[in-house]
């Protein structure tokens, strides 16, 4: 009886915790689409550097941060390194961890494509072709693959009122938005790690963001 009461109280506490979560950051518009395809994009300028210098710095970031820390295999590779002026392009597969506790690990394989083009001192980073491979942690379970369009898009993951995320895909949407933001921030920081935000002191900043 005591054990039943314990789990009932635990369920209530978890429910209250979920209800208190502020998901405003992840609601409508947080996961943009281009022609029906989930596509994240960030543009920024790097004054004082040539296109080749910008491209080389970003290629180093892709190799040393994204590829090096990803899962080794056919799903992680550099497709184009931009050495002849073409866009940098890399396929990345990495582990996206939701919870990691003793005797419990909740994670998925996060797959995406990062494309970077540089022109006239401006870099454009695009992350698209996103999918998730789940189920490999459960013994005897079959893995399933979901595309971002059917799992974390506004239509697939937000209720009709536009006020809440559906529980089944909420963690994927949150983690994806956070991971994409992290990649954008790291890429910009590779030019000047201690740069100040342009809104605060634009004259002392060498990387100018264009939203």
Which ranges hold each PLM region?
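Ser/Thr-rich, low-complexity intrinsically disordered terminal regions
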Residues: 19-211
């Amino acid at each position: 009886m005591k054990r039943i009461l314990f789990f009932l109280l635990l369920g209530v506490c978890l429910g209250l915790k979920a209800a208190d979560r502020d998901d405003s950051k992840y609601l409508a518009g947080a996961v943009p689409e281009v022609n029906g395809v989930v596509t994240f994009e960030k543009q920024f300028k790097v004054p004082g550097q040539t296109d080749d210098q910008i491209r080389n710095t970003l290629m180093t970031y892709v190799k040393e941060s994204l590829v090096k820390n990803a899962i080794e295999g056919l799903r992680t590779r550099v497709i184009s390194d931009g050495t002849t002026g073409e866009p940098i392009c890399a396929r990345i597969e990495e582990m996206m961890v939701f919870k990691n506790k003793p005797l419990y690990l909740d994670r998925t394989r996060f797959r995406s494509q990062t494309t970077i083009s540089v022109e006239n001192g401006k870099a454009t980073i695009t992350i698209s072709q996103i999918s998730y491979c789940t189920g490999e942690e459960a013994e005897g379970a079959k893995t399933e693959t979901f595309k971002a369009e059917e799992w974390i898009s506004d239509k697939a993951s937000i209720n009709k009122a536009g006020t809440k995320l559906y529980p089944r895909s909420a963690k994927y949407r949150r983690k994806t938005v956070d991971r994409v933001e992290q990649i954008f921030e790291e890429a910009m920081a590779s030019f000047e790690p201690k740069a100040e935000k342009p809104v605060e002191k634009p004259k002392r900043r060498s990387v100018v963001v264009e939203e």
